[in-house]
Amino acid sequence: MSDSENDYSDESSGSEYESPVKKGKSAPKKPAAAGSKKKASATRKPAAKKATTTTTSTTKKSTTSKKSESDNDDFSGDDKSSSSDNENVFKNIASSAKKGKSIEEIYQKKELLDQILLRPDTYIGSTERQEEELWVWEDKRMVHRKVSFVPGIYKIFDEILVNAADNKQREGNMKFIKVVIDREKGFISVTNDGAGIPIQVHSEHKIYIPELIFGNLLTSSHYDDSEKRLTGGRNGFGAKLANIFSTKFIVECADSKSKKLYKQTFTNNMRSKEDPKITSYQNKTDYTKITFYPELDRFGMVEFDDDLVALLSKRVYDIAGCNPTLKVSLNDEELGIRSFEKYINLYFPDEENAPKVYYEKVSDRWELAVTLSKESQFNQVSFVNSICTVKGGTHVTHALSNIVTAIQEQVNKKNKGSADIKPAFIKNHLSVFVNCLIENPHFDSQTKETLTSKISSFGSRCEPSEKFIKRVLDSKSGIVASILEFAQFKDQSALKRSTSSGGKKGKVSIPKLDDANLAGGTKSEDCTLILTEGDSAKSLATAGISVVGKDHYGAFPLKGKLLNVRDQSTKVINNDEINNIVTILGLKYGKVYETLSDLRYGHLMIMTDQDHDGSHIKGLIINMVHHFWPTLLRMPGFLVEFITPIVKVFKNNQKPISFYTMPEFLKWRETNDKGWDVKYYKGLGTSTPGEGKEYFSDLERHKIDFEWDEGANDNIELAFSKSRADDRKKWMAEHIEGTFLEQFGVKKLTYSDFINKELVLFSIADCERSIPNIVDGLKTSHRKTLYSCFKRNLKKEIKVAQLIGYVSEHSAYHHGEASLYSTIVGMAQEFVGSNNINLLNPAGSYGTRIAGGKDCSSARYIHTRLNDIARAVYHADDDPILSCVVDDGKKVQPKFYIPVIPMILVNGCVGIGTGWSSTIPNYNPRDLIQNMRLAIDGKPLKPIKPWYRGFLGSIEANQGSKVQGGQYLSKGIWKKLSDNRFEITELPIGFWTQDYRELLDELETPGTRKKKKEEKEKKAASRKGTKAKPTTTKRSKRVDDDDDNEKVTEATVKSYTNYSSESTIHFIIDTIQPVDEINIEKVFKLVSTINETNMVVFDEEGRIQRFATTTALQEHFFPLRIKHYQMRKDFLSERLSEEYSRLSNKARFILAVVNKELVISNVKKVDLINKLKEMKFDRIINKNSNKSARDKIKKKKNAFDEEDAAISSDEEKDGAQEEQDDDTKGYDYLLSLPLWSLTLERVKKLIEERDSKKKEWDILLSTPIQEIYKRDLDALEKALDDQDAYDESLKNQTESLKKRTKTKALPRAKKISAKVVKDTKEAPLTKLVKPTVKIPTTTDSNVSGSKRKKSDDTTSTSTSTTTSSNTKPIESFFAKEDKKPTPAVKKSTLVSLDSDSDFDDDVVVSSKPKAPPKKTSKVIELSDESDQESDQESDQGSDPESPPKRSKAPPKKPTTIATKKATTSKSKVIDDKSSDDEVIKAPTNRPTRSRVPPPKSLSFLDSDSDDDDLYDNEESSSDSD
């Protein structure tokens, strides 16, 4: 039995229906009952849910709880206990039976009208009085207060009012609605003009149309669902409900077409009606007027009270606001509301602290306004086709989706340290007003409190403009700030709760902690915790602690840099590193420390590397303590730093000298450089344990106490607070180069000095690593890589892994290999969206646009070399004039290279440093070449726009953008194929293929991304052994409180097909809606923005500058480039002059010796020097010590014989004798000539070279630098032509191969026989048991055959031979058969191979007679060897304990394993062809296999370069690699 079957079980006996109201009238205790209801309501008040604007609900939970009292008061039934609808139905029947009721009396059928009167809740809501916090019209404004009202009477009024408003949507000429609420007479009338109701008889029902629609249930003009309507009526109840719940209901209709006036009166709850009165009507205006007298007794009312009138008046104002073109009047007073925006202002009338309201008319069907919620609780006032949806619905969720998403992105961006803010949390801080027109709306019930229509059926979309969203996000709105404030409060509360049980403990168990013995005890204040930078530093500290003792000193290694805890509360909770430190020290969040006795340690010592990153770690620790426990920093001696030397110098047996700062060492080196050996201590790991003990033995000398000062608070916040990024820019700009912190001998250090003199150096270095230089467009890591490639003259491919090592060694790169790997890969990538000019050549898989380069191979698999175009960009002739950086005491990369065009605009950049970030798009190098030519000619530069190599889409200026600086729109390419199909052949810049596939999956199946994210979090949590955190919050039953507020809410894509390759884009998409009805570019994200608003770079002086336009950047670059062309010309001219003089003097010298004018044998060197001076030979000292390595290689290449090599090599020996005086050095180029070069032939050749140099010199002097520049531009343009030809060849190759290759699938796999299927089922792999039988010994072979008989559990095989017919499959070793082994072949050719080597060129072949076959046990082991393990080279053959790894032997080579003589037990190895994963474990006594030696390891050419040279080319054209 269902609940519905018992709906009428509480009725009094009798089949005739009696009005419950009449019974209520006759009841003498009616007023008392009403009073008791109020009292009951008051007692339940504290438990009631707090009402808001959202909950202007006419049906509350209290309705159900009050129903029993209502039933008791309204009905005189005997069984009061059975009056509740929620009572058990069987109890009701049993109770009724006891009272003598028959089955007919228990089960009743009611007419619909009677059922409506009996159960009004379904149709109009409760008929009982209730109290709620609602908006009402009072004192000429909207007021939010507690209201006592009956929802039912409110609803019947609303039905008549909405009917009038619906006429506006049906009839556009409607002009007014007049509402009269007569409190004295107890009636309400609603009048509207517009198209009237036809006054004629319905042909089917034989009654007039007005009577049909106002006096008969289930009549409506809205039953045709194929018709798109924007009205509120739907179910055929509407106005009839007002008639049913009224004592009198008067209908008055004027029809100008039929010239009739219709008037009819209904009474007795629509049961009685008068005949219609039809009179003549001559007016041209149609109208409809409904007047009704609510049955107040039914609603427990005597009159229209103040609360009801205020509530009904508010609904009249609602209608006026939703229909601003209508003249709406209330009690003959026109309201004068002409827009929805003005209606909204009624809620905030001239308040001093009124929040700013942001309104937008999105379209003809959507109006939207958003403001900050004062109560931090979501409020909404919404209307659907003039119906007030007090509980919101899908329209509110849809209207807010874009806004909430934008706020969420903004908040999460500013609140990076905390957990992502959920949409529901954001909505709690919003108040929203929505007015919309929805086609054929669906509601949760007849009360129409919640819209339930699907968004796809709305007939329109609410898409607020970017301008509106930006206004909402503006700081003036206070929305983002309010959300951030509450989020931080929430995080801080969670943080405080997370360590509520912390504090001082005797012992703690934390991995890698070496706890002090007295820590946590009574003497804990005397203990010191040493935080070290990594494990290696901890070992140094441990060695030192052995000197001072473990009682008072503990050590704990940090994994790396600590988290910046400011605004990072949620991350702090989940940060193991910080939690460990808090536990070790015994700290508690939120506690103010006045003494150190509550801690496990009284001192915190920081021991980090003496470099920039070490300074940063110190700062982060200071920041953490200052943020959570600032009073600890004020306690003298709590925070201490341990300093170690950064440089030590050694000389013979003298005592080493230590330096603790680089400026200090450089100052010393100016006067004390000779004879000293220098050792750089970049990390603590450089120090030996012995040195560590020395440091700790003189602890007072190596520690510095931090001291609180007046400016400490401000300076620490300056360095680490996110809100002070602009202050940090000024802070770094004001730093004076050369300023350093004196450490050695200092006992105390103020926090301000540390921040302003030490930490600032890290911030500057961080920017140098992250932000490129305007001159060469390179960051430091890119410059070091390019320098190393030029130094090595990298013309032949080497592995990236090798290049990483080379760069680290030769450019003093001090960071991780992973960072350098990403740098090298990034310089070589050439897919769309990466480089316009890739300086390195990608030989291997360097990533594609499928994953944006993330799909690149490991460094050990890919190769690279210098790209041919690199030297066209960075000309070799500029190398000698560059100023180099000195690192670790040697010259490394230049401060900047000087390219032919501004490379900063060619490949762009993205970088984030301290206080600064930089984002520069890519531009066409040909445009830059053209602009440089214009600049050479003194003409103005042409504007350029972003350009990306290989991109087929369009990049256009965003004309509507109000962003300061240039903004462009990058658009993909799409084409309509049919009504519901289109194709995409290009994506906007930065949108990778894999990401786009995920977007299409989301558009096809909404929620896909969320599901993948949850799965990823679950996997990550399972690896850590923790529970995955829920990604969704608890959902509310209310539609507009739904937390799942994602951008994609409904499916748009029916299906799609992906034809994209690694370099091209091609998707064919089938849509659910017609293509023409979809905003393809927006929905499918085929447009992205490219900004020129953050072009930040270092200039040539090392200062950070921001450029507003690309033209300004080019104008800054050009004079710098011209200046360096002049420097290049001057240098080359000086060098040619020197070479001319050198060749002339050499020719004269050789000629003088040959003619015996100069005697060089048996002469003192001093006399020889004087003779050379007398003969006026030029003294030539190599001033241009920083010579181009390119010239050296060129000369070596041109040395055709030993004499040429000897003459050219003398230049490299200039200055080799450091102890010589200047006179001797000046003539070394002559005196170092070999004797066998002093010939007349050599004189002739030298004169020819001299004349050639003179000609070259003259040409150089006569060529303007502008002409030199143009030649370089021409050369670069030619290189670009070659690059374009290369790109085209790749494209043509693909097309050519596609034409030659027929597109077809692989042949289908063949079916297997039934016997094989049966065998497979009988012996499934899952049931296999690994055989483990001991290896037989020689003694076992002599056992009688009966003893060696195979049992059911023993596996036996025949001896493996070279004959394929005797080779058994692996299944034979698992088969339970007892077959005799096949006799072995008498002779066998044995081949020994190294299965691990790819170089098995030497094969040992032996032919030995075989002994009779003997049963030998095998141990077969299944291996799950990974690809990585198989890549490693190992000598398994020499290790009898380790099983050999299987590897496929080279083709056409036998793979039989050699065996021992018959006297020993034979080891048999099975050639398993069934599985690559099964590895055969050889017996312990297997014979030694012949092993082919590996090829000689490759090594770099030795470098004995001059430190004075920019490059020492280690790789000539005949590179051995």
UniProtKB/Swiss-Prot annotation:
It comes from the Eukaryota. Its EC number is 5.6.2.2. One of its GO terms (cellular component) is chromosome. Residues 412-414, 1085-1094 are annotated as: Interaction with DNA. Residues 1-87, 1007-1047, 1192-1222, 1335-1521 are annotated as: Disordered. Keywords: ATP-binding, DNA-binding, Isomerase, Magnesium, Metal-binding, Nucleotide-binding, Nucleus, Topoisomerase. Residues 1-10, 1201-1222, 1422-1438, 1503-1521 have a biased composition (Acidic residues). Residues 527-640 form the Toprim domain. One of its GO terms (molecular function) is metal ion binding. Mg(2+) 1 binds at residues 533, 609. The record marks 912 as: Important for DNA bending. It is an enzyme of class 5 (isomerase). Its cofactor is Mg(2+); Mn(2+); Ca(2+). It catalyses: ATP-dependent breakage, passage and rejoining of double-stranded DNA. The active site is at 861 (o-(5'-phospho-dna)-tyrosine intermediate). The record marks 860 as: Transition state stabilizer. Binds two Mg(2+) per subunit. The magnesium ions form salt bridges with both the protein and the DNA. Can also accept other divalent metal cations, such as Mn(2+) or Ca(2+). ATP binds at residues 163, 192, 220-222, 233-240, 446-448. It is found in: Nucleus. This is Probable DNA topoisomerase 2. It comes from Dictyostelium discoideum (Social amoeba).
